[in-house]
């Protein structure tokens, strides 16, 4: 995390305009991704019979209702984070165990859908951005994912990083790269959020799913134990170990998704 802060400070000194624009892109993507995640929990809970989130004003796109300061900071610097959990009352569920599982997975499902939708839009944009010769050359080499997968050190990586001039000569509609950058970031952040929330650590969604689906609600930790686990988990996040592991998983999944959507380019 601290190396990320140092990099941002250095970039502000060497390229202040570009760094500020990047931070604005990141802020928009973080807000949207976290809000969608939490609203999905509340909406599914409402459909399952629990109106708590709606009654407390959490079924809204207002970021002030959702953002957690520490989770947002982690999202900016670590690309993984969290928002304020949507309040639910499982006692209102029509089918306690089934509905608890559905609500737990709702945020993850919403982020995965946003990732896939963003990649679909990015694929359409790639068809509009790059010259036909470039697309044909990549197709012949079996490398069309280079236009979508930010982990490939390729066209998508450059667009994601805002380095438009590097391949500007190969673009027929260069200004669309600014639009595609937003959707590539949305794809990466939503995938990262989905994978991160699958971790079986309280208070993440993966823990709630594990508790209900595997242990049938028997993981009754006391508040002190939960607090200790969360503190240890934060230290693991800040150490960078978890970030490297999640990047490996995200890269693998992004490769699969990119291969699928590259077929329409």
Predicted segments, located by residue:
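Hydrophobic transmembrane alpha-helices and their immediate loop junctions
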Residues: 1-265
């Amino acid at each position: 995390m601290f190396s990320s802060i140092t990099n941002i400070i250095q970039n502000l000194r060497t390229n202040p305009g570009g760094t500020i624009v990047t931070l604005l892109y990141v802020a928009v993507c973080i807000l949207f991704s976290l809000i969608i995640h939490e609203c999905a929990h509340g909406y599914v809970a409402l459909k399952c019979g629990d109106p708590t989130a709606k009654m407390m004003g959490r079924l809204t796109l207002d970021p002030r209702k959702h953002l957690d300061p520490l989770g947002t900071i982690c999202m900016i610097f670590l690309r993984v984070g969290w928002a304020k959990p949507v309040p639910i009352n499982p006692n209102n569920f029509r089918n306690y165990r089934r509905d608890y599982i559905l609500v737990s997975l709702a945020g993850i499902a919403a982020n995965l859908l946003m990732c896939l939708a963003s990649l679909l839009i990015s694929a359409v944009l790639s068809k509009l951005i790059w010259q036909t010769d470039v697309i044909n050359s990549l197709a012949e080499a079996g490398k069309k994912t280079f236009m979508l997968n930010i982990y490939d050190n390729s066209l998508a990586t450059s667009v994601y990083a805002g380095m438009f001039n590097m391949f500007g000569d190969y673009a027929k509609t260069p200004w669309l790269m600014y639009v595609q950058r937003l959707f590539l970031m949305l794809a990466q952040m939503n995938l990262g959020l989905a994978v991160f929330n699958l971790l079986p650590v309280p208070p993440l969604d993966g823990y709630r799913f594990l508790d209900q689906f595997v242990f049938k609600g028997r993981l009754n930790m006391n508040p002190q134990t939960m607090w200790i686990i969360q503190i240890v988990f934060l230290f693991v996040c800040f150490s960078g170990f978890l970030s490297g592991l999640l990047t490996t998983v995200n890269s693998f999944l992004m490769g699969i998704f990119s291969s699928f959507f590259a077929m329409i380019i």
